[in-house]
């Protein structure tokens, strides 16, 4: 707790420090939303001029600014003026504004409901996607994250805008060697080589084929919900050749006996029981020599602050970051066994290869 006291030296106790931190988070959110930081000149701006520029009542602006000046988020070059320290200037950048707003709205709006959520649902991690802290915080306690976004277009737009800037994106290629798939390309021309399950608009399958061009695109299948599949860019030469199937991974797998079932950044979003449903649907479609490849962030046994925070972020939506033991549990419950794990050297990304257990 010493870190919170060093952040706010006048805090009498850690509790006071956490209170000051909450105040700072909320005031910064208001400043970001109303572009107050953007209106502050490099050499400082008077509170009166800033109120005129932003349309905020001067009394409110002064009260909010007083705290940010006291906490060193803002500076005061002279009485009645506000300045921007170098580190705060990042809030003039679109990327930082989008990300901060997203994590504040999605995380804090959910986290304040944790006590109520756990009181109602028991002291356990979310068991169902339609029983999540996010849904409770948004006013829809029986809806999943994606259901809530469907009902709240503004939040969906903010979410999509933040995701579009690629914060913390994980690599697709360079982790797992797909060259072995090439050897099977000519043995059975009718066999599907790779099924990209829940593959969105085809970013991953395209990257895999570009990395290993000897894999014929026509022997690959892109699967996602019909409304996602219809937006796949047909002008792309590779994706034009890939077969498209509109389906849900919660339904029976329609492509049977494929060599590889590839699923990237999907299981991360769902609780264990629903992941088992997804994997069992794949297992039921597997041939004896099929392989399942799961591309996800792999949680170390002793995660850093950032990784542990990311896991709790996912908990808000009933999702979960998993370590090797957790993936082993999913495998054994779904009729698979882990055969290898390929890890990215520069991140926590990994491709977990599983084989169907033969009865």
UniProtKB/Swiss-Prot annotation:
Binding of S-adenosyl-L-methionine, residues: 198-199, 224, 248-249, 264-265
Keyword annotations from UniProtKB, A to Z: Methyltransferase, S-adenosyl-L-methionine, Transferase
UniProt cross-references to PROSITE patterns, sorted A to Z: SAM_OMT_II
Consequence of gene disruption: Abolishes the production of equisetin and accumulates the intermediate trichosetin.
Keyword Transferase: yes
E.C. numbers: 2.1.1.-
InterPro entries given in the database record: COMT-like, O_MeTrfase_dom, SAM-dependent_MTases_sf, WH-like_DNA-bd_sf, WH_DNA-bd_sf
Pathway as given in its UniProt record: Mycotoxin biosynthesis
Database matches in Pfam families: Methyltransf_2
Catalytically driven reaction(s): trichosetin + S-adenosyl-L-methionine = equisetin + S-adenosyl-L-homocysteine + H(+)
An annotated GO BP: secondary metabolite biosynthetic process
One Gene Ontology molecular-function label: O-methyltransferase activity
PANTHER family for this protein: O-METHYLTRANSFERASE (AFU_ORTHOLOGUE AFUA_2G17820)-RELATED, PUTATIVE (AFU_ORTHOLOGUE AFUA_4G14580)-RELATED
Family: Belongs to the class I-like SAM-binding methyltransferase superfamily. Cation-independent O-methyltransferase family.
Primary role: Methyltransferase; part of the gene cluster that mediates the biosynthesis of equisetin, a trans-fused decalin-containing tetramic acid with antimicrobial activity. The PKS module of eqxS together with the enoylreductase eqxC catalyze the formation of the polyketide unit which is then conjugated to L-serine by the condensation domain of the eqxS NRPS module. Activity of the Dieckmann cyclase domain (RED) results in release of the Dieckmann product intermediate.
Protein name (database record): Methyltransferase eqxD
Organism annotation: Fusarium heterosporum
Upper classification of the organism: Eukaryota, Fungi, Dikarya, Ascomycota, Pezizomycotina
């Amino acid at each position: 707790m010493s870190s919170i006291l060093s952040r706010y030296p006048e805090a009498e106790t850690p509790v006071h420090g956490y209170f000051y931190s909450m105040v700072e988070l909320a005031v910064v959110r208001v400043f970001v939303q109303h572009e107050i930081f953007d209106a502050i000149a490099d050499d400082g701006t008077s509170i009166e001029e800033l109120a005129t520029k932003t349309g905020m009542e001067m009394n409110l602006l002064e009260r909010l600014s007083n705290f940010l000046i006291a906490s060193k988020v803002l500076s005061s070059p002279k009485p009645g003026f506000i300045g921007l320290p170098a580190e705060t200037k990042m809030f003039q950048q679109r990327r930082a504004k989008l990300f901060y707003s997203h994590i504040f709205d999605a995380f804090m709006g959910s986290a304040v409901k944790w006590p109520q959520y756990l009181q109602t649902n028991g002291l356990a991690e979310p068991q169902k996607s339609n029983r999540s802290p996010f849904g409770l915080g948004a006013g829809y306690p029986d809806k999943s994250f994606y259901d809530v976004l469907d009902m709240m277009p503004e939040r969906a737009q903010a979410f999509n805008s933040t995701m579009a800037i690629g914060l913390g994106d994980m690599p697709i290629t360079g982790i797992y060697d797909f060259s072995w798939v090439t050897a099977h390309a000519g043995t059975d021309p009718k066999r599907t080589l790779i099924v990209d399950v829940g593959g969105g608009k085809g970013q991953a399958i395209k990257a895999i084929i570009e990395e290993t061009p000897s894999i014929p695109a026509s022997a690959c299948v892109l699967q996602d919900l019909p409304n996602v599949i219809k937006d796949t860019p047909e002008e792309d030469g590779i994706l034009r050749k890939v077969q498209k199937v509109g389906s849900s991974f919660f339904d029976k797998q329609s492509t049977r006996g494929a060599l590889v079932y590839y699923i990237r950044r999907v299981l991360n979003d769902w609780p264990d029981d629903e992941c088992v449903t997804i994997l069992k649907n794949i297992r039921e479609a597997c041939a004896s020599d099929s392989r399942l490849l799961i591309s996800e962030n792999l949680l170390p046994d002793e995660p850093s602050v950032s990784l542990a925070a990311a896991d709790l972020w996912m908990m808000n939506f009933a999702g979960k970051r998993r370590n090797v033991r957790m993936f082993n549990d999913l495998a054994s419950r779904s009729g698979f066994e882990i055969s290898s794990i390929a890890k990215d050297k520069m991140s926590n990304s990994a491709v977990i290869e599983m084989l169907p257990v033969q009865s």
